[in-house]
């Protein structure tokens, strides 16, 4: 029934107009799973390798024909005849065949696309939704929850062509009783934010993740205009809607000088000064979560940040941990951050992703399931969030089909599961 008979890779286009890898896994029973790898813009230096061709004559060097060739060649040969239900075995075969610590031979984009396609094929063979199959792979069959969305409604940093240093300003619809109601709140705030920005003469063009990307006077002004939009939508900031930020601070860290250079504001900070800057913002606004608040290598600074803010705020490690259990284990041991961002292309397989989520939860850290800035219509992260009962998801704003595809899948899942998948809102956020 679930024996693999064919593995196929192809080059498709992502939401930024760059190529990415799509894979199909065909089973003897006729079931097929298909999945595509996402791609990041602000990336951690210790992420698994995304293999690009480097041929400047094609897609400005960003082609993925080498990764596709790995799928259609050695990966396909190794997996044909194997049982798709044995996800850990499938993933380990590809990891061993690649033979590197960071999947540099085949590319994490090749291995991940096949890994996810395999999971989809196996779920189909078992006549169950992907989220239910993921729950079984996770060792938590039948345990589900609907995630609280972190909705990125103002884009800056590497995700936008503007002067805003902090990469993401997000809202969380914590006053909602259901995921679907939360999305309605998010949409209403998003539309009111457009009106607020227009009234101030700001652009309402959007960035990579569907949030607005205006040139603002300061990072604090981003929070101020969001606060205005929340009120204009008829909601109470701090009660119905809370705030979150992804600083992506590695992108404005001057390694040689050892300072954080926020060019948009013309300010520089030491690690300790930047931690106090974030603390001041959190005092002024109901910010409940801060991601990558320092450079990925600034572990001493992160330790100070955790001591300063960790009992009050969720401190999420993205570039810091890169969905890697070895690095996460070090962070847990040293008491650095209290949450991990989960991006399965940072590590390159579903099995390793599930291991990172489990390690985080076992240590009392939260796990936030995340998209990348380069996405496709693939909505697997919605099923991952529900099937692991992770509790939180980051998948962009209320525009761009590559973002909304994930929200729409969550709506379908909530409809199917009903009370079996509670929406716990702010209770899911560390420190709240």
Swiss-Prot record:
Kindly list the GO CC terms recorded for this protein: cell surface; extracellular region; phosphopyruvate hydratase complex
Q: Where in the cell is it found?
A: Cytoplasm; Secreted; Cell surface
Name the PROSITE patterns on file.
Answer: ENOLASE
Query: Where does this protein hold Mg(2+)?
Result: 246, 291, 318
The free-text cofactor remark is: Binds a second Mg(2+) ion via substrate during catalysis.
| Any one Gene Ontology molecular-function term assigned to this protein's record | phosphopyruvate hydratase activity
**Which E.C. number(s) belong to this protein?**
4.2.1.11
The residues responsible for catalysis, as annotated, are 209 (proton donor), 343 (proton acceptor)
Q: Name one Pfam family in it.
A: Enolase_N
Which cofactors go with this protein?
Mg(2+)
- Binding positions ((2R)-2-phosphoglycerate): 167, 343, 372-373, 394
Q: Is the keyword Transcription in the record?
A: no
Identify the keywords attached in UniProt to this record, alphabetized.
Cytoplasm, Glycolysis, Lyase, Magnesium, Metal-binding, Secreted
Pathway membership? Carbohydrate degradation; glycolysis; pyruvate from D-glyceraldehyde 3-phosphate: step 4/5
Superkingdom per UniProt:
Bacteria
The family database entries (InterPro entries) matched by this protein are listed as:
Enolase, Enolase-like_C_sf, Enolase-like_N, Enolase_C, Enolase_CS, Enolase_N
Keyword Glycosyltransferase: yes or no? Answer: no
Query: What is an annotated GO biological process for this record, any one?
Result: glycolytic process
Q: CDD domains from the xrefs?
A: enolase
Coiled coil segments of this chain: none
Q: What catalytic reaction does the record list?
A: (2R)-2-phosphoglycerate = phosphoenolpyruvate + H2O
Q: Which NCBIfam families match?
A: eno (TIGR01060)
- Sequence similarity: Belongs to the enolase family.
Quaternary structure (record): Component of the RNA degradosome, a multiprotein complex involved in RNA processing and mRNA degradation.
- Name of protein: Enolase
Taxonomically, what lineage is the organism? Answer: Bacteria, Pseudomonadati, Pseudomonadota, Gammaproteobacteria, Vibrionales
């Amino acid at each position: 029934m679930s024996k693999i008979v064919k593995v196929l890779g192809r080059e498709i286009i992502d939401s930024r107009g760059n190529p990415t890898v799509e894979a199909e896994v065909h089973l003897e029973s006729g079931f097929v799973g298909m999945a595509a790898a996402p791609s990041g813009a602000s990336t951690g230096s210790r992420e698994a390798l995304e293999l690009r061709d480097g041929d400047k004559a094609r897609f400005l060097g960003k082609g993925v024909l080498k990764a596709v060739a790995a799928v259609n060649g050695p990966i396909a040969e190794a997996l044909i005849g194997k049982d798709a239900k044995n996800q850990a075995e499938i993933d380990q075969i590809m990891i061993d065949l690649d033979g590197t610590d960071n999947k540099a031979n085949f590319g994490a984009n090749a291995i991940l696309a096949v890994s996810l396609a395999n999971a989809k094929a196996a779920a189909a063979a078992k006549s169950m939704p992907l989220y239910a199959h993921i729950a079984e792979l996770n060792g938590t069959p039948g345990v589900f929850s609907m995630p609280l969305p972190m909705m990125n409604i103002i884009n800056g940093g590497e995700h936008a062509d503007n002067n805003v240093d902090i990469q993401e300003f997000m809202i969380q619809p914590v006053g909602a009783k259901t995921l679907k109601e939360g999305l309605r709140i998010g949409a209403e705030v998003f539309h009111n934010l457009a009106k607020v920005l227009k009234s101030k003469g700001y652009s309402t063009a959007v960035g990579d993740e569907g949030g607005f990307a205006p040139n603002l006077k300061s990072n604090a002004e981003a929070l101020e205009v969001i606060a205005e939009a929340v009120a204009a939508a008829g909601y109470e900031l701090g009660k119905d809607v809370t705030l979150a930020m992804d600083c992506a601070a590695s992108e404005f860290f001057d390694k040689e000088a050892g300072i954080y250079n926020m060019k948009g504001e013309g300010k520089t900070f030491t690690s300790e000064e930047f931690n106090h800057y974030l603390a001041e913002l959190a005092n002024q606004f109901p910010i409940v979560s801060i991601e990558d608040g320092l450079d990925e290598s600034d572990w001493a600074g992160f330790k100070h940040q955790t001591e300063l803010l960790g009992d009050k705020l969720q401190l999420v490690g993205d570039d810091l941990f890169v969905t890697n259990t070895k690095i996460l284990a070090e962070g847990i041991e040293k008491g650095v951050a209290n949450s991990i961002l989960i991006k399965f292309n940072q590590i390159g397989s579903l099995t390793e992703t599930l291991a990172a989520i489990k390690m985080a939860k076992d240590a009392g850290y939260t796990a936030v399931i995340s998209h990348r800035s380069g996405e496709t219509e693939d909505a697997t992260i919605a099923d991952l969030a529900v099937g692991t009962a992770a509790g939180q998801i980051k998948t962009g704003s209320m525009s761009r089909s590559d973002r909304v595809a994930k929200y729409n899948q969550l709506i379908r899942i909530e409809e199917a599961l009903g009370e079996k998948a509670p929406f716990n809102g702010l209770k899911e956020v560390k420190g709240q």
